[in-house]
Amino acid sequence: MKLQVLDANGTSVKEISVNDAIWGIEPHQQAMFDAVIAQQASMRQGTHKTKTKTEVSGGGRKPWRQKGTGRARQGSIRAPQWKGGGIVFGPTPEKKYLKHVNKKVRKLAIKSAFSLKVQDKNIMIIDQFGIDKPSTKAMVKVLNNLKVNGEKLLIITTEGDEVNFKSSRNIEKVNIITSAGINIYDLLNANKLLVTEQAIKAIEEVYS
């Protein structure tokens, strides 16, 4: 498979061959679903907690005597049926939400997401941004040239690309990650992918 490579002006400068096993497979919906659920589960802090009857402050003595008042018997004003009482079977921080997805399925999900973007023509490859020092204005100009400014965009670059990281971090709807930080949620959450040519090579080294 061949994909167009653009320059910072949005002009096609060449074509490169990419691995069909990464960019041209039939997207596996179940693998992508499982990987997204697993990633979202791992993002949960799990610090939720409610107090039981024994943990709520107060309620140490019986509110009224057992017999003779005509009212229902009560042992504590912190029993669950009382306002301000303890919670029965509430959430505790001991609950674990982690879901396991094996490496093979996770790789299949990433390849499926890449292939889906290619099929939908929602991926662009850029040779270089041509930005010498951090500049949000310069990055916005490049995105305008590529006609993706205002889109929910994921930029994938390589390690050590501090200039482009700093140039894009204040732009609304733009997220930038390295090829080593690729994850299924960011890929599917973005409407468009903008990948550097060097990142394409790094991705193919890992996922081939």
UniProtKB/Swiss-Prot annotation:
* SUPFAM superfamilies, per database record: Ribosomal protein L4
Question: What is the role of the protein in this entry?
Answer: One of the primary rRNA binding proteins, this protein initially binds near the 5'-end of the 23S rRNA. It is important during the early stages of 50S assembly. It makes multiple contacts with different domains of the 23S rRNA in the assembled 50S subunit and ribosome. Forms part of the polypeptide exit tunnel.
Q: Name one GO biological process term.
A: translation
GO CC term (a single one): ribonucleoprotein complex
* GO MF, any single term: structural constituent of ribosome
Name of the molecule in the record: Large ribosomal subunit protein uL4
Q: Where is this region: Disordered?
A: 42-77
Organism domain of life: Bacteria
Q: List the PANTHER family hit by this protein, alphabetically.
A: 50S RIBOSOMAL PROTEIN L4 (PTHR10746), LARGE RIBOSOMAL SUBUNIT PROTEIN UL4M (PTHR10746:SF6)
Regarding protein family, the annotation reads: Belongs to the universal ribosomal protein uL4 family.
**Pfam family, any one:** Ribosomal_L4
The record describes its quaternary structure and partners as: Part of the 50S ribosomal subunit.
- Entry keyword set: Ribonucleoprotein, Ribosomal protein, RNA-binding, rRNA-binding
